[in-house]
A protein has these predicted regions:
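N-terminal export leaders
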Residues: 1-7
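Sequence/structural signature of beta-propeller domains
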Residues: 7-310
Length: 310
């Protein structure tokens, strides 16, 4: 979901892919704070060099290939470059437009608002869309996108408050959470689902007061991380928090709420944080976050990387 925000920082040189608009990404550091999660570093993505912004969801695989989608219906893939464990830049990007079932690129506007991304064990990509609420399945992101059975009731979501979080859980089920589809009996709860085609089960998720869910990622233990965002113009603009939801909470009938792991700020810069990804890296879990600049010169497209003992 689009928001307004902070001033864009000037870009400088970096050891990463160079395009007509300059380097694709510029590294910067994140201050370490007490807590279970250790910051490894961050990148500012040069959307002029990339050709678009609006990055709304991401995936980082075991080979450190970063995949992201945009709410303008575009996608890109690039290798995450490291110096030791520190993000140093991005390799050359492959980009494209998401397509419909016939292979035609999605029409501009309402059909292109891609907000959620998950990868199934067989490599299929699932992309969740707002405004026209639906899920499409892609064998590869440059292939036609077939309709994937959406959770029952998703069509009732507000136009700009639909499916923001779509995560593959360790047991093969999907976790789907809406941004602003309230529970009819309790407006502090958001409607969501766990399961898949033919097995969707409704759940209720409780974000922190004033926050909205923007993404989720499954954990190896069967739980999940959920990213929540808040925008309050008179209180400094954006803030976000990353919470851990236990596997037991996802199995039970009660409303789901998470245990905070990160608060942004102070655990990282204030921005429009929209995407989260998790991968196992040695003994630690690496957590990646991405922000959506809304293709607005006063906001930034940032990627941050953290290590967590889990």
């Amino acid at each position: 979901m689009r928001r307004r925000g902070l001033l864009l920082s000037a870009l400088s040189g970096s050891a990463c892919a160079q395009g007509p608009g300059g380097p694709l990404a510029v590294p910067f550091s994140i201050a370490a704070l007490p807590g279970p999660i250790r910051p490894l570093g961050a990148l500012q993505i040069n959307t002029q060099a990339l050709g678009f912004g609006g990055l709304s969801a991401l995936h980082l695989d075991e080979g450190l290939l970063l995949t992201a989608i945009s709410d303008t219906g575009r996608w890109f893939r690039a290798q995450l470059l490291l110096r030791g464990e520190i993000p140093a830049g991005l390799g050359p990007a492959t980009t494209g437009m998401l397509r419909d079932g016939s292979g035609e690129t999605l029409s501009r506007g309402r059909p292109t608002d891609a907000e959620a991304l998950a990868r199934r064990p067989d490599g299929t990509w699932l992309v969740g869309f707002e405004r026209w609420h639906r899920i499409r399945a892609y064998r590869s992101l440059d292939a036609p996108g077939a309709f994937f059975e959406a959770p029952p009731g998703l069509a009732n979501a507000p136009s700009n408050g639909g499916l923001e979080a779509l995560a593959m859980l360790a047991d093969g089920r999907l976790l789907a959470i809406t941004e602003f589809l309230n529970d009819p009996a309790d407006a502090s709860l958001r409607q969501g689902w766990i399961g898949g085609p033919g097995t969707w089960r409704p759940i209720r998720y409780r974000p922190a007061a004033g926050f909205a869910v923007t993404d989720a990622a499954g954990l190896p233990d069967g739980g999940a991380l959920v990213l929540e965002r808040r925008f309050a113009l008179m209180e400094g603009g954006f803030s976000a928090r990353l919470v851990r939801v236990s596997a037991a909470a996802l199995r039970g009938p009660d409303p789901i709420a998470g245990e905070p792991l990160l608060n942004l700020p102070p655990d990282g810069p204030a921005e429009n944080w929209e995407g989260v990804t998790v991968l196992r890296r040695g003994a630690a879990l690496w957590i990646g976050l991405i922000s959506d600049d809304n293709e607005n010169a006063f906001q930034r497209s940032l990627f941050m990387l953290y290590a967590w003992a889990g």
